Structure formats: structure tokens, C-alpha cells
Amino acid sequence: MSETGKLKIIPLGGLEQIGMNMTAFEYEDGIIVVDCGLSFPDDDMLGIDLVIPDITYLRENKDKIKGFFITHGHEDHIGALPYVLKEISAPLYATKLTMGIIEGKLEEHQIKDIVKRKVVKYGQNINAGKFRVEFIKTNHSIADAAAFAIHTPVGVIVHTGDFKVDYTPVFGDAINLARFSELGKRGVLALMCDSTNVLRPGFTPSERKVGKTFDHIFAEHTKNRIIIATFASNVDRVQQIINTACRYNRKVIVEGRSMVNIISVAREMEYLKIPDNTLISIEEMENYTDDQLVLITTGSQGESMAALSR
């Protein structure tokens, strides 16, 4: 290629760890940032609620930053945004549901009105300095996840974000493997790929299989109250729980701050379809017998502050 400039890939978090995902890409006088997540403290980090990446380099070069590009709406990819965007002013790009979740955080931190934002569709390209970022459809445990093909003067970098290959997703389209194939044939300078659980044998089953499991559980426990702990952001799974609850004529209680917030956003954006009179408050539980209730809560990983533990 005729271009002789140097491309820098600068990991700021998320490598060899779960959480705090953040990577900067720099070419000449331009920087773009992919993801901006947090992680939770180790047991010996007393008095610390959360951990965010060290953004010293970005702070020192904030005039070069052309934008933040977010792959999906999990905390380990978006949780640091409110803190970072208070110091660094740059446009924010994400898909519809991801942006909706982010906007809730920005509003909570009272910076929503000062952050420039753009909702991006799959297949759309965003020009940011000498970078061109293409959004590609993927599947993950949250809707609207994206991979990026980052087109630079010296070649294409493919950043997968978190993903799984699900040929039979419950909602929406399957991962766009055809586009990844096209990029591969044309030549890729670097592949930055999710490697969570890569050393474990086997493969991740389709989310559709989880729905069948719910049906078995509900059929087996017709006289009991059912409590299901899951990630708040797993909108597809929450939808399957609600669908199953409706089939078995059960009311649904949602507990946990993050669960309530994300369900509210997803419902407003029509990523969740909940029939009228399905949801009830926790105070209304006493009006129903156990066999009429399903409780969806946070705390599936035993988090001490989650609703299930409390």
C-alpha cells in the first residue's frame, strides 16, 4: 500500500481478564476507542465498588479522539463511559438497544445532554478521521451486539466484540458470517477475537435450547413459586421466561435495579413484548399463590449486592 503511516493498537483493558474492555486505535492524528467497560473489585480490594481502565493516554491525547464505538450493552463494555465521557468529549456510536442502555447511564450521571450520540444500523459505515468503522451483525447474550471492521489506510482490523455463533437465534437474525468471509477473502491486517472459554471443549448451545428447558421446569413445578436468576441484559432470555410464564398463567415479578432498568428500555424500544397485566410489583405478591408466580432477578453469579442475595 502507498500509505506509510503507523497504526497503533493500544489495549487499555479486557485482555487476559474478564471485564474492563477498552482498546484504542491510533493512526497519525486520529484515535478511535472501542468499548469502555468496567470490572468489579477483587475480594481484597476493600472499599472499592468498581474498577475502570487507566485512561491516562487518552486524557493526554484527547484532542485526537474521533469517537467511541461500542460493541454491545454489557457492563464490562459500557460501564466506564459515564466516568470517561466527563473528561473526554467525543461522539458516541452504538446500535439501538446498546445506545438506549447507555443513555440511561448518561442521564443518571447528568451528562446525557452534552454527549453527542449516533445510533448505527448493521452494515452502516462511520467515518472518523482516517478510520472507517463498519458495524456487522453478531449474536451474543444481549440483543444488538456488533462486530467492527475497522478500515484504515494500512489495512482492515476485525474486532469481533463478544459473540457466539447461533444459527437458530430466538429473535432477530443470525450472525453475519457471510460478511466475515468476504472480509477474509479481501485480506485482514489483524483479527481481534473474543476468546472467552476458548479452552473448554464443545460449543455454546443455541438460546432456543434454553427456552425448551424453561418449559420443562415450569411443567415440572406447577405447584411451586419459580425464581429465575439471570443477567439483566439477556433480553432474549427474559423474553423466553415471560413467554413461558404466560403459557402457564403465571404473573411475573422483576426484581433488581439493573433488571428493572434494562427491561424498561428494551420494552420501550420494542425488543421485549410483554402482554398487559403480566408484570406485577413485589408488593402484590401476597395477592397470589406460589403456583401463580415467577420471579426474575439479578444475581446469577452470586453477586453479594444483587437482588437474589438480598
Please place each PLM-identified region on the residue numbering.
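Short, conserved beta-strand edge motifs with alternating hydrophobic and charged residues
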Residues: 296-298
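Loop/turn-to-beta-strand initiation segments
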Residues: 292-294
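His/Asp/Glu-rich metal-coordinating catalytic cores
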Residues: 2-69, 74-290, 300-310
